[in-house]
Amino acid sequence: MSTPRTIVGVSGGVDSSVAAWKLAQDGEPIAGLFMQNWADDGSGDCRAEDDRRDAVAVCGVLGIPFHFRDFSGEYWSGVFEHFLAEYAAGRTPNPDVLCNREVKFKHFLEAAQALGAERIATGHYARVAHLGGRWRLLRGADRNKDQSYFLHQLGQSQLAATLFPIGELEKSALRRIAQDAGLPTHAKKDSTGICFIGERDFREFLGRYLPARTGEIRDPQGQRIAEHPGVFYFTLGQREGLNIGGVRGRAAAPWYVVGKDVGSNVLYVDQDRDSPLLQSRWLQSEQAHWVTGAPPARSFSCTAQTRYRQPDEPCTVTVQDDGTLQVNFERPQRAVTPGQSLVLYDGEECLGGAVIAATDAPLERQLAGSSFSSEVVA
């Protein structure tokens, strides 16, 4: 058998299975490679072995070689340590973005090239086009499944060596293809959540690595409402898991996280889902990454997402001298969260993005610039 020109990242899911099937149907010399990115920690919840068996089965049906690589060490140092540091600092990271940049489109690409392949293919809902002398990252045709948000840190060399075979497909059509092709993953449930946590309780998992420290939950006026198990378990806008019972003199309505003071170990909540304390029209980012290697201009208009699957929000972007971004939105944004990814778009094209550093939300701004009085908001 000739050396495969393309190595497909087979995850054991239906998306990568159909990606491999499409390339095989095109007569492309391919092989499959399964990446183990998380070592079994003894919890009994690691899904990697089941996924690996499914990946082997798919490669068997397609009649293509199967390879295995353990990238758990690279994942730990390149993704998980950053994940823990961000949570410890009170921010909410996005490990999927780092996993794509540091593992799937770095170590996997290198492993494929070491096997003699020219490029890799994955089951991401995204598209690549070569326009104007540059490689462009485009949204997937299925807007509900589009994964360009998680791929915005990719660059020219990575896109030049990457295929997204299912980028033009709708999920419903992909399922039908998988069933008609007899792929053993055709009915497999889509994976959700953070890959290394799986179905486990998030607090229990995080508590293994970050010692919990209980503290006060306060309302915006500084009144003690309840007690929390650790501020890093919560993110802005969150409702679930606060376990705030009836509070004397307060309506029987849900509470929402509106601020975190990691230094004083205080969590701030409000009963208004759209509290003014959660609203921001401006954000500052860390250093930005541009898919084509450079921004469109020093100042330009585009649309942005500050969380996955968020509707596009019109904004104006100003590139600072140090490469960071100042972004002004046309209308207020709810719960823009430091540590999450800001991703910028021009129509179908993903321009790039950056990690959100700060916003002008009233409570966040006051917490960042004061010594934390007992009454945070007058």
UniProtKB/Swiss-Prot annotation:
SUPFAM superfamilies: Adenine nucleotide alpha hydrolases-like (SSF52402). It catalyses: S-sulfanyl-L-cysteinyl-[protein] + uridine(34) in tRNA + AH2 + ATP = 2-thiouridine(34) in tRNA + L-cysteinyl-[protein] + A + AMP + diphosphate + H(+). Disulfide bonds join C99-C195. Residues 94-96 are annotated as: Interaction with target base in tRNA. Keywords: ATP-binding, Cytoplasm, Disulfide bond, Nucleotide-binding, RNA-binding, Transferase, tRNA processing, tRNA-binding. Its main location: cytoplasm. It is found in: Cytoplasm. The record marks H124, Q340 as: Interaction with tRNA. It comes from the Bacteria. InterPro entries: MnmA-like, MnmA-like_C, MnmA-like_central, MnmA-like_central_sf, Rossmann-like_a/b/a_fold. The active site is at C99, C195. One of its GO terms (molecular function) is ATP binding. Coiled coil: none annotated. GO terms for biological process: tRNA wobble position uridine thiolation. The keyword tRNA-binding applies. GO terms for cellular component: cytoplasm. Catalyzes the 2-thiolation of uridine at the wobble position (U34) of tRNA, leading to the formation of s(2)U34. NCBIfam families: PRK00143.1, trmU. HAMAP family: tRNA_thiouridyl_MnmA. This is tRNA-specific 2-thiouridylase MnmA. It comes from Xanthomonas campestris pv. campestris (strain ATCC 33913 / DSM 3586 / NCPPB 528 / LMG 568 / P 25). The lineage of its organism: Bacteria, Pseudomonadati, Pseudomonadota, Gammaproteobacteria, Lysobacterales.
